[in-house]
Structure formats: structure tokens, C-alpha cells
């Protein structure tokens, strides 16, 4: 079989302007970037008032190093729905260069279920992530500069010379890190302001851009005005009295928003069979809320009969945050969920680690790992929507094990179960899955959130841990206990919680496989994201700046004299 890159290069692409017109966009609603991609102007939101489509959210079992094929299934299902004569659109996140050059690789799908050209999607796209980085770092430069000048001049002289209010920033009161779109562990904790005339020194650090609150704001905003208002609420620092200093207080919110004026527009590309795909925003699902943008979904639902999107990692991560953060804030309600699994994933979740063992038939291990799939089925079903299991088939899978798994799923809360072979067969590989999903979308459902807005903040943490993960409870560090009191006293207890934890286990501990029980979720820190509209709970050892592994992905990537990039897929 050809490589992903070769398949992408051989694709018969539609001119993006023609594809956009078929999708229902007017010429002045598209800002073209050559013939392969276009920004979609938000005026289409006003022109089309009603959402007409069914929203399908794709999630997965607990992820493993072997890859479950969630994006492959998202794109493949989109292609199959189109092949059945439906007007359909996929909505996915923009890939971060951290995973592209790290361990995961690209995020365009794979095989014959791809968004193309895949190299353009995986590297830069239309520059949205760079715009987020630039806007974020402008905020960091602005608050550091303000601290420098206020310290240098004092209150009276500062106000006299600048005409601005003295913010009285507390020593070590700056909360706003800098960001970069790479995995770079040495930047996690740094000292800034060192040296003469460089400002008061303070401890800071870098996060990956996907963890920036600005990225979450981009993904959750309804329009440009909403994004501007949210950016104004960003908490950059605290003053000596402990009060928050916002981007609006600093006077930098407008400039930060201006840097993201084009980033607020989704990017239109296409699948291998010419279905439209909107790519927008890129928050990670382990350290952020892990879903593409509200704006992209809104536009797609106004133009398509079916919209297929995905949440990052397993249903305890991106799907949970789709429901309790994205859907809560936007009012979007999915019609059905597709839960991706593989024989390999179930065996890995039983405790097997070697490729040889996982690829070999092993009925006992498959049955042991099935508990993880059943947990995820029940986890999705508790939100009140039908769940369809998609078994992503690999060449090493045996018919006997696949048939056993299909039969086992029939005894669960799942609406249906189908094989998916879109990686090798493209649109033909998920026709049965597409038909089952269409039937599921017609079922009566009552989408339900896990907890109400007015639940106490500590109770939200307990509910997420005990109901959302099956934990025995939550423990808060001394710092988290103080932060809990502060956030409640300041009136932020109504916000939803974004758990930042490992994706490699339903629990907080990546070593606990299958369906862990009896564990306590350790919350070490609570972080207010006032602009994004949620509180992040940092759990266990999760990091907001990843590091490169022993054998990073960049080792495979190169470019020839002809300009052709190799090694992305």
C-alpha cells in the first residue's frame, strides 16, 4: 500500500473555490490560499440563520501507542456519508507541530481516509497557531513591560508620564507564561528579567501553544465580538492586594485580538473524495479541552446534513470536555457518538505491551480488554445519546476475534457496531458504519450534561472523578484547597471544570490499565481560565509543555531539491 504522503500527492483535488461553492459558500465568503485551502468569512453565520445538520462526535477507547484511528474514522465516515449521497462536512482541529515532530506524527487521517494535501495541513496550514502564539506572547511582553516601568518609576511618576493607571503588580504576581508550538521541556520553568535594565526578575515558563488559554478561546468563541470580549477577561497577573489584572486592565486585549483577526476564520480543505473539511483551533485534550471550534461546527451545521467532528483521546477526555465545556457553552448537542476501538487497543488495555503479543490472536486478553470498551460505551451513553462502535480493522486482525467482538458489543448499551476499513478502502470501507450512524441520528435522544452550572466547585471535581472516571474520590493539595476557596469567593464556582490528566488511563495514573478502581484523583492545582470560561484542574504529573521523546518524529522528515516533503506519513 502507498504511504499516506504518496496517496495525498496522487489525489485528484477539486479547486477549493469550486468545492466551497458546492458546499454553499458565496465567493466573497472565501479568502483563497491558492487552490487547496481557503479561509471562511464569518459573514456566512449571519447569512444562514438556522442549523440544519446532525452533529456526530467521534471518540475512542483509552488510547495506546498503536493508534486507534480516530481521525481516520472521522474522515473515513465523512467520505462514506458523502458516497451515500449526503451533504456532509468534517470539522477537525489544526495539528500542533509538537506532536508532528514528536511522537504522534501528522493529524490528517491516514491511508485512503485523509484530508489533503496532508503536508499543508500538518505544517503551518494558514498560520492560525502562529497567530495564537504571537497574540499570547504579546500579552506576556505587555505585562512584563508594565511591571518594569511601574517598578522603575513608582505610582505617581508612572501615571504622570504614561497617562495610565498604576496596576500595582505583585512581585512574582505575573501568571501569564509564554508559548511556543514545539515540545521543549527545558522551557517549562525559567527565570526572566535577569540582568541590568531587563526588569524585575521572576520565575516563569513556556507552555505549548495548544495549551494556551487563547487557543481555548479561539475554539469556544461564537464570533469575533465574543472572542474580543473573552480576551479582555484573560487574567495575566495579580496585584499586591491579590486582585486579578486582566488583559483589558492592561490595555492589550484589543491588540491581541487584532493579531487573531484572521485566525477566527475556519480553514476549508477537502477529503480524498472531495468532501469539505473545516479545520479550526487546536487545543490538546489532555491539558486543554481538546475539540475543534464552535464557529466551524456552527457554519458546517448550517450548510450540511451531517457534520462529523472528533474529541481528542478517549471518551473520558475529549468527549467529556466536548459535552461539559463546548456543548455547555455553545448550546450544540450531538445526535450520536461514534466510539472507535481496535483489537490491538483492547489487548493493550488488558496489559499486553509488546507488538508481537498484541498482534497475535489472544482470546483471553481480548476478553479482558473488552472491559475498557464497555466502560467507554457506558460513559458515552450516560450523556443521553446513541453510541455506535466502530472497529477499525487492521491487517493482522482475525475474523474469529472480530466476530467475537461484534457479538460482545451487541450485549452492551451500544446502538450498533460496525467494522471500519476506510484506511485501506476509503469511502467504500465505512458504508455500513455510515448507514448505522444515520439510523442512530434518527433515534430519540436527550443530551444531558454531567453536572449543573450551580453545583459547588468541589462537588464538580468529585463528580468528574467518581462518575466520569470511576474513582473512589478526589484529594486536593494544600495549594489547590486555597485556590478552591479563592475561586469560590471570587464568584467563579459556576464555571465548568477542565481536568488536565494523562490520556493513557481512565485514571490519573498511566500505569493503571483497563478499568481501574479504588483510586483517588490527586488535584495539585486549580487554574482560572476566565476568558475561556472554565477552571483547569491539574492532576498528577501532567505537564503543559511536553518534551520530545528518545526517537522523535522529526528524524523521518526531510525535503528534496524538488521541494517535496517526505516522512510526514
Swiss-Prot record:
Keywords: ATP-binding, Ligase, Nucleotide-binding, One-carbon metabolism. It is an enzyme of class 6 (ligase). Pathway: One-carbon metabolism; tetrahydrofolate interconversion. ATP binds at residues 64-71. It comes from the Bacteria. It catalyses: (6S)-5,6,7,8-tetrahydrofolate + formate + ATP = (6R)-10-formyltetrahydrofolate + ADP + phosphate. The keyword Protein biosynthesis does not apply. One of its GO terms (molecular function) is ATP binding. InterPro entries: Formate_THF_ligase, Formate_THF_ligase_CS, P-loop_NTPase. Its EC number is 6.3.4.3. GO terms for biological process: tetrahydrofolate interconversion. Belongs to the formate--tetrahydrofolate ligase family. HAMAP family: FTHFS. This is Formate--tetrahydrofolate ligase. It comes from Shewanella sp. (strain MR-7). The gene is fhs.
Amino acid at each position: 500500500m502507498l504511504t499516506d504522503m504518496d496517496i495525498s500527492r496522487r489525489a485528484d483535488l477539486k479547486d477549493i473555490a469550486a468545492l466551497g461553492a458546492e458546499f454553499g459558500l458565496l465567493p466573497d465568503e472565501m479568502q483563497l490560499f491558492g487552490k487547496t485551502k481557503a479561509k471562511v468569512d464569518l459573514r456566512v453565520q449571519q447569512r444562514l440563520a438556522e442549523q440544519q445538520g446532525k452533529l456526530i462526535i467521534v471518540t475512542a477507547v483509552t488510547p495506546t501507542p498503536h493508534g486507534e484511528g480516530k481521525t481516520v474514522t472521522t474522515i473515513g465516515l465523512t467520505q462514506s456519508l458523502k458516497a451515500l449521497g449526503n451533504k456532509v462536512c468534517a470539522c477537525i482541529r489544526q495539528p500542533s507541530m509538537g506532536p508532528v515532530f514528536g511522537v504522534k506524527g501528522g493529524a490528517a487521517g491516514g491511508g485512503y481516509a485523509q484530508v489533503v494535501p496532508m503536508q499543508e495541513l500538518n505544517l503551518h496550514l494558514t498560520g492560525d497557531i502562529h497567530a495564537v502564539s504571537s497574540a499570547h506572547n504579546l500579552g506576556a511582553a505587555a505585562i512584563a513591560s508594565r511591571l518594569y516601568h511601574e517598578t522603575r518609576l513608582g505610582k505617581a511618576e508612572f501615571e504622570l508620564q504614561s497617562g495610565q493607571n498604576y496596576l500595582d503588580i505583585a512581585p512574582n504576581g505575573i501568571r501569564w507564561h509564554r508559548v511556543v508550538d514545539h515540545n521543549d521541556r527545558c522551557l517549562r520553568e525559567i527565570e526572566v528579567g535577569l540582568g541590568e535594565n531587563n526588569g524585575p526578575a521572576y520565575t516563569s515558563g513556556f507552555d505549548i501553544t495548544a495549551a494556551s488559554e487563547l487557543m481555548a478561546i479561539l475554539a469556544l468563541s461564537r464570533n469575533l465580538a465574543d472572542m474580543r470580549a473573552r480576551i479582555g477577561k484573560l487574567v495575566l497577573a495579580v496585584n499586591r492586594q491579590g486582585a486579578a489584572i486582566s488583559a483589558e486592565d492592561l490595555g492589550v486585549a484589543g491588540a491581541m485580538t487584532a493579531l487573531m483577526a484572521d485566525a477566527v476564520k475556519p480553514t476549508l480543505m477537502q477529503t480524498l473524495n472531495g468532501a469539505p473539511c473545516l479545520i479550526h483551533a487546536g487545543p490538546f485534550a489532555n491539558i486543554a479541552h481538546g475539540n475543534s471550534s464552535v464557529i466551524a461546527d456552527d457554519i458546517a451545521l448550517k450548510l450540511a446534513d451531517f457534520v462529523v467532528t472528533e474529541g481528542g483521546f478517549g471518551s473520558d477526555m475529549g468527549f467529556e470536555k466536548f459535552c461539559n465545556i463546548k456543548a455547555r457553552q455553545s448550546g450544540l448537542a450531538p445526535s450520536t457518538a461514534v466510539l472507535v476501538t481496535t483489537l490491538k487497543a483492547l489487548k493493550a488495555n488488558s496489559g499486553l505491551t509488546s507488538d508481537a503479543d498484541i498482534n497475535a490472536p489472544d482470546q483471553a486478553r481480548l476478553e479482558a480488554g473488552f472491559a475498557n470498551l464497555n466502560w467507554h460505551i457506558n460513559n458515552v451513553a450516560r450523556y443521553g445519546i446513541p453510541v455506535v462502535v466502530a472497529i477499525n480493522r487492521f491487517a493482522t486482525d482475525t475474523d474469529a476475534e472480530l466476530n467475537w467482538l461484534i457479538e460482545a458489543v451487541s450485549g452492551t448499551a451500544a446502538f450498533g457496531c460496525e467494522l471500519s476499513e476506510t484506511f485501506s478502502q476509503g469511502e467504500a470501507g465505512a458504508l455500513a458504519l455510515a448507514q448505522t450512524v444515520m439510523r442512530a441520528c434518527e433515534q430519540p435522544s436527550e443530551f444531558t450534561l454531567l453536572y449543573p452550572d450551580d453545583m459547588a466547585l468541589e462537588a464538580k471535581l468529585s463528580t468528574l472523578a467518581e462518575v466520569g472516571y470511576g474513582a473512589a474520590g478526589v484529594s486536593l493539595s494544600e495549594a489547590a484547597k486555597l485556590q478552591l476557596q479563592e475561586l469560590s469567593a471570587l464568584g467563579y464556582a459556576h464555571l465548568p471544570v477542565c481536568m488536565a490528566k494523562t490520556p493513557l488511563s481512565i485514571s490519573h495514573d498511566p500505569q493503571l490499565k483497563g478499568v481501574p478502581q479504588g483510586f483517588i484523583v490527586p488535584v495539585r492545582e486549580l487554574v482560572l481560565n476566565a476568558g475561556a470560561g472554565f477552571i483547569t484542574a491539574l492532576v498528577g504529573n501532567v505537564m503543559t509543555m511536553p518534551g520530545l521523546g528518545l526517537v522523535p518524529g522529526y528524524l523521518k522528515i526531510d525535503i528534496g531539491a524538488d521541494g517535496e516533503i517526505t516522512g510526514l506519513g
